[in-house]
Amino acid sequence: MNNMDVINAFPGYEYIDGKNIYRGDDLGKGGYVYAEPGMYGNVALLDVASMHPNSAINLNAFGEYTQNFKDILDTRIAIKRGDFDKAKHLFGGRLAKYLDDESSAAALAQALKIAINSVYGLTSANFDNPFRDVRNKNNIVALRGALFMRTLQDEIQKRGFKVAHIKTDSIKIPDAT
């Protein structure tokens, strides 16, 4: 993982006294959270699909094994979208035999989600494990997502929309057109 590449993609980011400062906000160490209290109508809820797993892939967090992680993620997404033919050929076809009965596909997608999120979580665990990179002192995968969501907030507000809420990988925009 090259932290400098992540940081350079977001000009203005600073690590000051153990804090992730970007555009005047302390982003914390996990997912970015923002709220404008109030009651809203006609709220668009937008979700960044698999944000942390995709960040891990883009950061090449698992070195030579990153492609396997990506294949598992792509398989899960194909199953979730009902594209079973595609899913049967992904990940070297290893999961094809579990996709003959499409009624059990949701359970397989959920099992893959648990595996994917567990692996991501272990990248920043406080204990030694095969997925933890000791150089990752700042949870770089979550930081990349937080920087992206904070940038997205500014871009949406710049276009005249209110941002009511952000939580890690989702954003709520009242009266979105």
Q: Which residue stretches match the model-derived regions?
A:
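Common nucleic-acid-contacting/processivity interface regions adjacent to the catalytic cores
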Residues: 1-59, 106-147, 151-155, 165
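Compositionally biased, low-structure terminal segments
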Residues: 11-14, 85, 92, 162
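Metal-dependent catalytic core segments for phosphate chemistry
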Residues: 51-99, 113, 117, 121-122, ...
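A short acidic (Asp/Glu
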Residues: 55-57, 174-177
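Conserved core architecture of multi-subunit DNA-directed RNA polymerases
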Residues: 87, 91, 148-151, 155, ...
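Catalytic palm active-site di-aspartate
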Residues: 116, 160-175
